[in-house]
Amino acid sequence: MRENALIQFSSGRYYQGRGVLQKIGEESALLGHKALIVVDDTVWKKTEERVREYLRSASVEFVRYAFSGGCTEKNYTEASQIGQAEGCTLVIGMGGGRAIDTAKIAADLMGVRCITVPTSLATCASTAWLSVHYREDGSMIGNYWTRYSAFCTLVDLDIAALDCPQRYTAAGILDAMSKYPEITYNLIIGGRFQKNAFSETAALVARHIFDELLEHGESCLNKLAQGLVDEE
């Protein structure tokens, strides 16, 4: 029994593969006619031309919030104010966890949905319901639970795998593997998770990911070093 509590697993829509950034136009159009894009200068230089083309083809306008720093009240408040003033009907967060978390909170403050585009395979923020926000001095405030998880997540492997330092992918592999002992500990010993179908499913998925990455993680890194992306 969940005592009428809301159950939410992850993004409502998830795409992964080479070239899936082209989906950004049609997915944005499902949410309206104008997007607020939260993205830093480095990522924008790599993606601007394609994003402009894909949004234009779907008749979606956009305004950009030039992100820098961390997921702070200043950043997500400024972003949301710009989005509201410009009449934006959705938010797109592009980059790493800090930019994406900022976009998710800005969307929550605006009362609209968010599309996430991670540029690293070490970015779990793109599908997580919560955001982690910080003070200006870098100290953590805590978790910010938005009303909705991401509407859609686009993991373009041409960007997140092939155009990203390999150390980030290695970090992502280890982070994903750590979920199995973390979830198992909290189910059996820690007492943080209630035992039910949802937590047990999470443990099974985490175990499967752990086993797959233990077996194939090293070979995947070797292939990426050669510029190869395949079913493995």
Question: Which role fits each region the language model picked out?
Answer:
Residues K23-E27, R50, E78, I82, ...:
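Alpha-helical scaffold segments in soluble metabolic enzymes
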Residues M1-L90:
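ATP/NTP phosphate-donor binding region
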Residues G12, M110-V205:
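A glycine/threonine-rich phosphate-anchoring loop and its flanking beta-alpha core
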Residues L21, W44-E48, E73, R98-I105, ...:
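Short glycine/serine/threonine-rich phosphate/pyrophosphate-binding segments
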